[in-house]
Amino acid sequence: MSEQNHPQTEPQLDENQIIALRREKLHNIRQQRNAYPNDFKRDSFAADLHAQYGEIGKEELDPQGIPVKVAGRMMLKRQMGKASFATIQDVSGQIQLYLNNKGVSQEVLDDFNHWDLGDIVGAEGTLFKTNHGELTVRVSGIRLLSKSLRPLPDKHKGLSDQETKYRQRYVDLIANEESRNTFIKRSQIIQSVRNFMVGEHYLEVETPMMHPIPGGATAKPFVTHHNALDIPLYLRIAPELYLKRLVVGGLERVFEINRSFRNEGMSVRHNPEFTMIEFYEAFSDYERMMQMAEDIIRNASRTVNGTANITYNGKEVDLESPFERLTILEAIKKYNPHYTDEQLNDAEWLKKEIVKHGESLPPSPGIGSLQLALFEGCAEGKLWNPTFIVDYPVEVSPLARASDTKQGLTERFELFVVGRELANGYSELNDPEDQAERFKAQVVQKDAGDDEAMHYDADYIRAMEFGLPPTGGCGIGIDRLVMLLTDSQTIRDVILFPQMRPE
């Protein structure tokens, strides 16, 4: 807004004084009229006006007198003699308003001059361009639609306090265009994933959020109580077992995008409630699921970024090339070539090496569990470009189908990008007797103190006994996918209202 001379700012008052002053203004408005009218009808968005008229020259645009009605939050306001300029912001962007006593009455102008930054206004008028070429609405009528009682963050400093950003996301969205764009992209990513699944002839379904038995993943659940039934219920840690029941029922391709809950720690990549997609396909296997995961992620990147070659934290990530595939042991040796096969199959050596890398020993320290723990300590964080880690041990994969050719391993994968897990999938175990034995082994682990071990789910076994077709399944963390595709460094930046300690 180069025409303006001096921006209008709040008096040099503290926040409480500013709020008190604004409340007084609101009281005065209430004495005269409805302070919160709801009859202004907007017909234009800022971005649409810029797209349609932004390239038209002043000489061509001004004589047309194109009428518009716009509405939004006042972000800038400046007076220049008998005229005033303001910038309002709607969901699509910003547009400038111009008021003078030729377009509106002096009473309206005086009223406008008492309004504050953050107020929500509706204006009508005609489009023109300033001498500096800025598309502007020459206002013929303007109304205050909602009074802002609290001051916005400083225009130049923005909302810099991270905790305030997360606690008061509404202020963050007002003040920070980058945050708004991140959450717009999040919505586009989810829509891209949904469209892709529908294009693959999958049926979107909804399964329970409260489970009588927690299952579908190894994690600690949140527990609640149903008063009428007088039973404990568990917020779901994964929808897997219900989705596979649907495959038993003949819904051969199903997916669900929804929340899951895990009563675990919080970090830059963990929030107690999170969004994921899980999908299952009959007459499929983990090879098909790996290709599906690869295609979903690549397609989402192209949709929101226009390319599958992106940058994360200043470093390139190649989502375009076929994703690499390694076993757990291959990944360990890739980054630690001095390790020998003998060492990697020695339980005592593995335990010492795990501790050396700062990892905790697994609750059930079989060779497979120990190898996985070492992988997490010495290799996982180095997997920058997308890499499928395949063929997980049976003991850490209680729902995955055992390999026909590799003793003690399963047809399971996890996908890692920028050093963190993004997806998990496998050929589903569809032998009910084998599944029952694995559930029993999980119960033994739980009795030994492993809070994350699974319960025995008798109804799921009953469903399997009707016959689960050969099936592939996969889960992808939506929050982590959004982090990757928006170059966000913490999960809190991509969840609108992340879990916080109470104030």
UniProtKB/Swiss-Prot annotation:
Its main location: cytoplasm. It is found in: Cytoplasm. It catalyses: tRNA(Lys) + L-lysine + ATP = L-lysyl-tRNA(Lys) + AMP + diphosphate. GO terms for biological process: lysyl-tRNA aminoacylation. Mg(2+) 1 binds at E414, E421. GO terms for molecular function: ATP binding; lysine-tRNA ligase activity; magnesium ion binding; tRNA binding. It is an enzyme of class 6 (ligase). Its EC number is 6.1.1.6. It comes from the Bacteria. Mg(2+) 2 binds at E421. Keywords: Aminoacyl-tRNA synthetase, ATP-binding, Cytoplasm, Ligase, Magnesium, Metal-binding, Nucleotide-binding, Protein biosynthesis. The keyword ATP-binding applies. The keyword tRNA processing does not apply. Binds 3 Mg(2+) ions per subunit. Its cofactor is Mg(2+). GO terms for cellular component: cytoplasm; cytosol. Coiled coil: none annotated. InterPro entries: Aa-tRNA-synt_II, aa-tRNA-synth_II, aa-tRNA-synth_II/BPL/LPL, Lys-tRNA-ligase_II, Lys-tRNA-ligase_II_N, Lys-tRNA-synth_II_C, NA-bd_OB-fold, NA-bd_OB_tRNA. Homodimer. Belongs to the class-II aminoacyl-tRNA synthetase family. This is Lysine--tRNA ligase.
